[in-house]
């Protein structure tokens, strides 16, 4: 196998952290390009060549003709296909692989978008809208209840028996860990909480959580519930730009 040379373009968000964690778990060489969201670097022409949607994370595989990949789910599958040849974090069996992909999509299409909207209405909406806040917090909790049920007699989300730690867990872990950011209490989800805490103890996970800044916003929140929100200004700025460009 060609020596990997992965460039990760990222920021310290749940979607960014999930890919840095997987790269750390794989133990392959990679370099990080920090994308400053407050400066709209994700909208720079150089970044849009990698991801035309202007969102992090993205990777460029310089060991394979500088092949670009965007969307975290696609990045997971790409890295697993090319750099998890021993199936440590994925599955060789076709049924187990499909099991993993289903939970990967469950996070990407459900947990992430719904919890992201909960984040928005809890933290970033310029006016408080009870309907939006309750709708997305409740939907996030419903999705958490699906995960809670899945973990009743299992250690991990995908695989036969009690399951195996895989990219299905990594992709979901970072969002569940950010539950407090959306005002979600974990007391009703004891299995999910335990699963999250155990994954956080992994050495590779701890390293990945500090990419790219060396700081971890959730750890800051645990120490100080009133910690300054580093995302509010650019979220509101981005919403205004979208409204100005695409609004009626």
Walk through the language-model features, giving the residues of each.
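Phosphate-coordinating loops and pocket residues in cytosolic domains that bind phosphorylated ligands
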Residues: 49, 201, 210-211
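Positions that flank functional sites
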Residues: 37-38, 194, 214-215
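Short, flexible loop/turn segments with low-complexity composition
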Residues: 92, 207-216
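GST-like domain detector, emphasizing the conserved glutathione-binding G-site
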Residues: 1-134, 238-248
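Acidic/histidine-enriched, glycine/proline-rich intrinsically disordered or flexible terminal extensions
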Residues: 212-248
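GST-like fold's C-terminal all-alpha helical module
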Residues: 103-201
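Short, thiol/selenol-centered motifs that function as redox-active sites or metal-ligating centers
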Residues: 13-20, 167-170, 202
